[in-house]
Amino acid sequence: MRSDWIFGACAVPDARMRSAALARQEQLTKPPGALGRLEHLAVQLAAWQRTERPGAQRVWIAVYAADHGVAAEGVSAFPQAVTGEMVRNFARGGAAIAVLARELGARLEVVNLGVVNDPGDLPRVRRAWIAPSSANICEQPAMTATQLRDAIAAGADSIAQARSCDTQLFVGGEMGIGNTTSAAALACALLSQFPQAMAGAGTGLDAEGIAHKATVITRALALHADASSPLERLRRLGGFEIAALVGAYIAAAQAGIPVLVDGFITTAAALVATRLNPGVREWLLFGHRSQERGHAALLRALDAEPLLQLDLRLGEASGAAVAIPLLRSACALHNGMATFAEAGVSDA
């Protein structure tokens, strides 16, 4: 599969449905603007879904799992074996996102792109194997061109499946020991930030561990300083699951499926996606602001106002999943409230 599709045109939200939804909001039995951002969310979903009565019931959550070669630099508080162990946990339904997906009635897809501690074939896990791990970004590019293409395509495959199920909302998540280091390196390269400003605790590093992580990122940035395009920076500094998220976000925007972005790593992927294809930005909504140090800078770069700030830093799409009830409330109010005329209530 060629990768030039990522530069193709994105869908355009329906301006007529946006206007119709705005008009309905003005007629509902409440003062104008009294429901705050919930009103805006309903209108935005109406434009995205091309309907006056939007919904957020049919949700597709895809969690991409992959290991990172940079884990060899000691940038995580957990051993690399945890990635494969968590894939098993996803399959068994014991991970946070599995619990949240069940609670929400959402479809959960777990995609194994390559882990060192390979759990093999598991129920409810799609195997899109690329390699046991990306390469160590302090020594060489994270991915070959072929690996990058395959990872991006794996994300697009999720959207093809989601589209066939008439999905109303897509949520991407990730799992991979060392991936906050790769995401921070990508963010530094894209935003011209110092590693000290982007390196965070990740899985629970102390101050000394965070300082070491920043040093590792500095080494990686120096090695790949000649990478100038967003795609080449992704290839050299990213990882399989980050590239899959990029592919999923672009494919979703092209298919006209709204995306709810999770935390630090997924927002780094969203930034790459928008740099590759600016039309993607119009299809992104941001679930929460993570406790991870660099997330605020990424959100600012995307002019994003997240829905929640709960000091989360788990990943897995968990923060975005927690925000889904807000979207459902926005739609329920928009669709279910009476208008002034229907209720026989005097308008202002």
Curated annotation (Swiss-Prot):
GO terms for molecular function: nicotinate-nucleotide-dimethylbenzimidazole phosphoribosyltransferase activity. Keywords: Cobalamin biosynthesis, Glycosyltransferase, Transferase. InterPro entries: Nict_dMeBzImd_PRibTrfase (IPR003200), Nict_dMeBzImd_PRibTrfase_bact (IPR017846), Nict_dMeBzImd_PRibTrfase_N (IPR023195), Nict_dMeBzImd_PRibTrfase_sf (IPR036087). It comes from the Bacteria. GO terms for biological process: cobalamin biosynthetic process. Coiled coil: none annotated. SUPFAM superfamilies: Nicotinate mononucleotide:5,6-dimethylbenzimidazole phosphoribosyltransferase (CobT). Pathway: Nucleoside biosynthesis; alpha-ribazole biosynthesis; alpha-ribazole from 5,6-dimethylbenzimidazole: step 1/2. It catalyses: 5,6-dimethylbenzimidazole + nicotinate beta-D-ribonucleotide = alpha-ribazole 5'-phosphate + nicotinate + H(+). Catalyzes the synthesis of alpha-ribazole-5'-phosphate from nicotinate mononucleotide (NAMN) and 5,6-dimethylbenzimidazole (DMB). PANTHER family: NICOTINATE-NUCLEOTIDE--DIMETHYLBENZIMIDAZOLE PHOSPHORIBOSYLTRANSFERASE. This is Nicotinate-nucleotide--dimethylbenzimidazole phosphoribosyltransferase. It comes from Xanthomonas axonopodis pv. citri (strain 306). The lineage of its organism: Bacteria, Pseudomonadati, Pseudomonadota, Gammaproteobacteria, Lysobacterales. The gene is cobT.
